[in-house]
Amino acid sequence: MKTERKKIRPDYYDKFSCIAGQCPITCCQEWKIAVDADTNRRWKKVFPPDTMPGCAKSQSLDQVSGDSKNCGKNLSTYTCMKDGIRVIRLDEEHRCPFLAKDKLCRLVLAYGDSILSETCTTFPREVHRFADHEEDTLMPGCPAVIDLWRHKEITFPSVVHSNADISSENTWTNVSEHTMCVEKDENKMAFLIREHILALLGDHTVSIEEALLESFYILLELYKNQPITPELVEEYFSPETLQQLRTAITQAKSTISSLETWEECNELLQDLAVNYRKEGLYEKFLTPVITQAEYYSQIFGRQGIHVGEDMDATKGENEAGQLWDRWRQFRNAFASYEPLLRNFLRNEVFSDLILPENFETEPEEADNLEHMVLQMQWIAIAY
């Protein structure tokens, strides 16, 4: 008899609802909207709604294809192949052609929700199916999701400890006393590590940057010290070990100049924007931001400031010093978003640190940890 997978969801999940035309942006613009094969087959038999540009109300399917160059023969003609997948062909403004001016979907208005592709039906929902359970989360690309994270700390159900939620107050001192909900031995340690990282990122006595660094260093050490046991994981996340790690990180940070960190962030921003700019995506947002970033790079080169110098020594004396003053002002203002950013990062860890495809081929424990180390780096880069 087949056992149904247990569904695991954060506490905010069921509170989500699409705000449709009230959305300040739209999820129907400037990204690859995939169309699955089943939907594409159905779309070949459905002609565009009357509200589509160039599609006259009185036209039949045959008339549409013959008389109007702007109206597609069927819904499938509004798709194309890109990077090996079928996607909706966006218009010149990188918007979905089915998106109306009121930010509502012409297809839904004409045919109902069942006409949509799997991507449009599920977004911003994300589902990860593991061998013994299923994890549902929401992606941060939706403003309605961000609103759910703004004012309240979110919690995540435990897949390792029975009847437990993971918040900043959760600590576990004897893992062996709890029932493991994950059946496969090689997967248990990965989920246990994830739960400790979630708790660490929820600890408001530790800065976000410190929590990210500590999580990354612990993952690296665990990767180097195979095999992993529950006792070893507990030791690495114990208050004593964390305090030693924080002391070491503080000492290391004192040897790194403020400029080195700032300059690296500025260069990273420009690197991350390359592919988007190449495809002409998010131009209204990225163009002024990257122009400013390039200007800052020129300031440092023009002022002759090099990595290793103390930015405080230049305070207010030149362009670079004035920039540094503005940077500190920004950091102070940015601090007000810390609760939201903690929720964002903890959701990223829950949804992206462990991916189902990394467990499908019965991998070695070392492979699991290697994937987790790489995923942790991507999560930190996003922050």
Q: Residues of each region from the PLM?
A:
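Conserved aromatic-histidine-acidic binding/catalytic patches
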Residues: 31, 108-112, 130, 181-185, ...
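Extended, compositionally biased low-complexity polar/Lys-Gly-rich tracts
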Residues: 62-97, 105, 117, 187-194, ...
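Hydrophobic, aromatic-lined core segments that form the binding pocket/scaffold
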Residues: 205-383
